[in-house]
C-alpha cells in the first residue's frame, strides 16, 4: 500500500512538472480531467455536485466573512484567502484519494484513527481553549482540531470492523469497541456534545446497517442517551442552548440572542433574498456568521428560493449516494458510502436545522460553507471516499437496484 501511495504521489508530481499548466488545471479542477470519462456516471455526477457545492460555499463565505475580516484584519478577503489555501490542499487530497483503491485506504484507517485519537488526548494537557472548550492543538501556526479530522477515519474503521464482525476475534472486537467509546468520551469531555453525538451516530448507524445484534445496539443507544443527559446536566452552556432553543424570544438580548438574529436573517431574505453581499445581519448583528450560522447569511441573501435550491442539491446528492450504496456488491463499500452520506448530508441538515430554529444550537459546521481548514480537509476526505466507492462500482459488479424492491427489509441489502 505504501508503495502504491508513493508511486501515485510521484506520478502526481511528474504530471505537474511535465504537463505544465494543463496538469495544474486538471489537478485544481479534477472535474475536467480526461480520466473522469471512464468513471460510472453516478461518480461523475457526485464529483460535479461536490465542486458545485464547494463553489457556492466559497462565494457565500466571501460575503459572510467580509465585514468581520475588514474590521479585524483590515482585509475583507482575509478569511476567504485562507480558506482558498486549505481548499487547494483539500483538492490535492481529493485527487490522491480518488486514485487509491478502497482496500488501500482501509489499510491506513487504523493508523489514522489511532493517531487522531492521540491528538485528541493532547487537547487536554496542551489544548487551546476557546469559549471554555479545549478542542484545538497548535502545530506551529496551524490549529489542528482532532475531533474534526477523526470523522473520516471513524467512517473507514467502523465500516471495516462491522463488515467483518463475524470473522474477527473477540479480543479485536473488544479493542475496537473500547476505542470507539473512548474517542466519543474524549470529544464529550472537551466538551463538545454535538460532535460526540454525530460521531456516535455514525458508528451506531453503520453497526445497525451491518446487522449487529439488536441487544448490543440498544445497550449502546441507552448508554449514549444517559451520557448525553448527564452532559446536559453538568454543562451550563449546553442547558442554556436548550432553553434558548425552546423559547429564544424570552431572552432575545442574552441567551436567545444568537438564534433570534439567525431567525431574523432567514426571515429577512423572503422569497428571492436581499442579493449577494447585501446581508444586513452579517454586519455584527449575527455572531459567528461565517462558521456555524453561515446558512443564515445565505438565506438572507438568496432567500427562500436559494435555500430551496441548496436543499434540493443535498437531496440529489443523497439520492446519488444511496444509488452507490444499493448498487455496490461489497459490504464494506456499501457501509463506507452510507457513512459518508450521513456526514455530508446529515451534518448539513443539522446545521440548517439550527439556523432555522428547529434544532438546538450545536456548533457543527456546514460542509464546504463554514470557514475552517480542518473542516474543509475532512469534508474533502469524506467526499473522496464516497466518489472512490462509486468509481469502484463497476458495471459488471453493480447490483440491479430494482431487483431489491421485492425484499422485505432494507437491511437485506447489507447482508
UniProtKB/Swiss-Prot annotation:
Superkingdom in the source lineage: Eukaryota
| Protein topology in the membrane | Multi-pass membrane protein
Q: Which InterPro entries match?
A: Cell_cycle_FtsW-rel_CS (IPR018365), FtsW/RodA (IPR001182)
The protein's enzyme class: transferase
Descriptive protein name: Putative peptidoglycan glycosyltransferase FtsW
One example GO MF annotation:
peptidoglycan glycosyltransferase activity
* PANTHER family in the record: CELL CYCLE PROTEIN, PEPTIDOGLYCAN GLYCOSYLTRANSFERASE FTSW-RELATED
Report the principal subcellular site: plastid
